Each structure stands twice: as C-alpha cells, then as structure tokens.
Regions:
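Catalytic-core regions of core metabolic enzymes
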Residues: 1-504
Length: 504
C-alpha cells in the first residue's frame, strides 16, 4: 500500500494525504523523502520513532553542496543510526524492482522485468538507460540509484545482488568510492558469480573534477582503479554506448569461449573494417586449420577469400552462410564467430537470418551478427535478437562488444590463477621456509608465534616489519633504540598461542 504525506494538502492525486508519517497508524516498510534538505533530519526522526527502517532520500543538497550540506548529511546519519534506519541516497533517483511492481523513483518510465541489475551513482544515467532499455526490449531485476552513498553503498548493494535469484548480470555506473576496501571485496565476490560490466566517469582531469562536484567524492587514480577492477574479474567499458551494447549482449545467449574470432562476411570492405578494429583491441583472428580450409574450399565458390575474414561473396545465399558457419564451428582454433551481412542486390537479409537461427542451437561456438545498414536489414536484425543472437549495425560496434564480453570470461580465468609452487619472490628463500614448516609440524604445533610467522614470510620474500625478542624491560629499551621509535610491543608466549588454539 502507498501512503502520501504532506502537511499542506489533504489529498494528493485523489489519495488521502497525512500530515506526518506518525499519523498513519500502520506498519510502513519504506519511506521516500523528496522535500527540502533542511526538513530531512526531522523526517528521519519521525521515521525512526514510527519504526520505519528503510528510507530513500531523493533530495539533493547534502555533502555535494559544500560544508553546510556535509554537516546536514552528518546530522541525518547520526539520527538514522540512533534508530537503526538505513538510507539509500541522498541525491538519488530511487529504486525499481519490476517483479514486485515497485517503482520508488521519479523516472518518467519504469522497467520491464528481466535479469539485468543496474546500479548507478547517477540518476540521470539511470533515466537514460531505462529509456534505451524500453526501446530495445531489455528488462531488469533491479534498477538502483545510490546517489551520494552516505549510508548504503556499492558494497552492500553488490552483496545483496549476489544472492538475488532474479539477477544474472550486473551493470554499474561509478563516479567515486567512499569505502575502497568494502567496494573491492564485494566486487570481487560478485564477479566470481555474476558478470559485471562497469562504466566509471572521471578518467581524465576534467571528468574527475566534474564527478567530484557531482558526487562530492575525491577522485582516485584511474590507472589504479582500472587495474583493481580488472583483477577483480570485472569488465570495464569506456562509454555509454558500450554499456548499452554490453547489456544487450548479456541479455542474449552470447557466451564466447575465448577471444579467437572467425569473421564471415559477404563483402571484403566490411570484413577488413572488422579485422582492423579487432587489431586495435588486440583480438586475434583465428588461424583456420587445414581441415576447415578443405571444407570451405569444397563448399564455397572458388573466389572466396581463402583466409579469415572469410569472404563468401556478394551473392552469398542462406545455404552458403550456413555452410561457412558449420565449417568454422568445428575448428579447434575458433572460439566465436562474427557473421556479417551487407544488403547487396542478390542478398536476402531475412532469409540469411532465419538460416542462422535454424543452426544456432546446434553450434558449439557463440555467434554474434552484424547486419549493416538500416531499412533493408531492420526486420532481420530484430528476428536475430528475438532469437537471442546479438545483432548490430556496424562492425566496429560488434567487435567492441565481443572484446568486452570475451574479456569478462578471460578475467574469470585470471581469478582462478595462483602462483606456481616453485615461484620465488625477489629475495626469498622458499627452501628455508619448508624447513621451518617441517620443524613446526614435527613438534605437532598448530599456531605460529609472531617471530616464526615473520620468519616464514621473510623466506618467501614478503616484506615484514623488523621484529626482535626482548626478555626484560631493559632489553626492550635496547631493542627499541636499535629498531627506531615508535615501536609496537606484543607479548610472545607459547602459552598464549595454546590458549588461542583452544578457543578456536
């Protein structure tokens, strides 16, 4: 049920309005605040007294607005925490959960149900994605605009989405991070389970200044951020268009096994453009095996390109496209196939699309399509997309999309990599570490002392702070002078280790 609250009006859109949330007299699960910033603290107080534990603050004018706004934000958080109230925002669009029929935003349009989750710091970006999604028939499990992340942040949202059965893929728009440790921990955990596509603003100085003004957060080094999210297994895109197309691909059946690409085309020019963009992005074109070449030589006209890109001629029929696809899908050197079509005089774009759909489920490789043009190929593109096969207008777009999605699966493999047992860090002596561990095992020890732990780390080249053992206060003073002040003092005793062992 929805309750309207406004002290100045008796009704709002023909619904009765209450002067305060305390007048409702029924349990309220969530409140949405869209009033002047100065009124927010007292409204949070009222929510707390009424037992409301979840609040969305759409209102702007807090930490992003300077010192006065930041002080107001701190006051809001202090009151909220005293009542155990959680806050999404402030300065956010709100949240949409299509499956629940929940639209707690001021967006003009809502989202259809689907398996994509969108998490964004920018409400304007959410509105743009929603508009694009409606035109492209893309659905969402959740659309979450988190705004200034004064309380609930990226980390907690990601932790929730990991276990949300309706969410299969996650799209993120990021401007700044308040808690880097929590963000990276949640990001890494989520990316192990669900594909994450991330767009971050502020890559350059002007953009960083703009995001700092908008989000009220200090910019971080883009190089450091990029390396961190890549190691977490996340795919980072560079612009809004790539985010849209990645969303489109994730909602389809496209699952590349690797990044070795075969290109099938009915025109040399489009094939060359696709190959060039692949080269820009470091995507290797698959080297076709002798067996594949023999099959193609038998099935294609004599003037086919005899190389990858596989130009099958401007008069290519649906059957010729099908034969070319079937030939490369059994090639061990091919991970995925890009099928391109230019609407030439002898081409039937719709018939070719239908032929591809007929064999798509029989393939052991993923397909992505590029039907170039507009009027003559519009229906064919839609037919492909309805069948779960991504279809694009331009070869560069298709290649970029393939790059980002294949990079996700490649990043997942990196997450599983561990250093080999024989790998030795600079300055390390792994053999000495093995001797130490064997000695401890022989003593039936389960806990290392601090000095033993430091010694073990040192043998593997891991930097540790210098440590020394002192048996008396005088020795401790002497050791401290040797190490240099200030120093940390810890008790070193096997009895303490045994006690800890028993407790655990």
């Amino acid at each position: 049920r929805l309750y309207a609250i406004n002290p100045k009006h008796a009704t709002i859109q023909d619904q009765p309005a209450y002067k305060s949330i305390e007048e409702i007299g029924a349990r309220v699960e969530m409140a949405v605040i869209a009033t002047r910033p100065q009124t927010v603290p007292q409204l949070i107080e009222q929510c707390g007294r009424s037992g409301v534990r979840n609040v969305i603050i759409i209102t702007a004018g807090f930490s992003e607005a300077g010192h006065i706004g930041a002080a107001l934000e701190r006051k809001v958080l202090e009151i909220a925490r005293s009542y155990n109230v959680r806050i999404l925002g402030p300065n956010c669009l709100g949240i949409i959960r299509p499956e629940l029929g929940l639209n707690a935003t001021f967006a003009k349009i809502t989202a259809k149900a689907g398996n994509l989750a969108l998490v964004s710091q920018s409400g304007a970006m959410c509105s743009a994605v929603l508009d694009w999604a409606k035109a492209n028939d893309v659905g969402f499990s959740s659309v979450i605009s988190i705004g200034m992340t004064a309380d609930v942040d990226f980390g907690e949202i990601l932790d929730y989405l990991i276990y949300d059965s309706r969410t299969h893929y996650i799209l993120m728009y990021v401007e700044g991070i308040r808690n880097a440790r929590r963000f990276m921990s949640a990001l890494r955990s989520a990316a192990r389970i669900k594909p994450i596509i991330l767009l971050k603003a502020g890559r350059h100085e002007a953009g960083a200044m703009a995001t700092a003004t908008h989000s009220g957060m200090a910019a971080v080094s883009d190089t450091v951020f990029d390396a961190a999210v890549r190691r977490a297994g996340v795919v980072r895109v560079q612009n809004v268009g790539q985010l849209f197309y990645a969303a489109k691909a994730l909602a389809s059946k496209f699952r590349p096994l690797g990044n070795r690409l075969a290109i099938i085309t009915n025109g040399g020019g489009p094939g060359a453009m696709a190959a060039d963009r692949a080269g820009d992005l470091g995507i290797p074109l698959a080297q076709l095996t002798n067996e594949t070449m023999a099959v193609l030589n038998k099935a294609m006209p004599t003037n086919w390109s005899h190389a990858n890109p596989i130009d099958i001629g401007g008069d290519a029929t649906p059957e010729r496209y099908r034969d070319a696809i079937m030939a490369v899908t059994h090639d061990a050197n091919v991970d995925s196939t890009l099928v391109m079509l230019s609407p030439q005089v002898m081409t039937d774009p719709l018939a070719v699309a239908k032929a591809i759909i007929e064999v798509a489920d029989k393939l052991n490789r993923s397909l992505i399509c590029c039907w170039m043009g507009e009027e003559q190929v519009r229906e064919a593109r839609q037919v492909l997309e309805d069948a779960g096969i991504p279809a694009f207008r331009m070869p560069e777009t298709a290649i970029e999309l393939f790059h980002h999605i294949s990079k996700y699966y490649r990043n997942q493999k990196l997450l599983l990599q561990v250093p080999s047992p024989g790998r030795q860090a600079a300055g390390g002596r792994p053999g000495s570490g093995r001797v130490l561990v064997d000695a401890l095992i022989a003593e039936r020890r389960r806990v290392l002392s601090r000095m033993e732990a430091h010694a073990l780390l040192h043998t593997y080249g891991v930097p540790v702070r210098p440590s020394m053992v002192a048996h008396t206060a005088t020795e401790a003073m002497f050791v401290a002078e040797q190490i240099g002040l200030p120093v940390d003092v810890h008790l070193e005793s096997p009895d303490l280790a045994d006690a800890f062992d028993e407790q655990t």
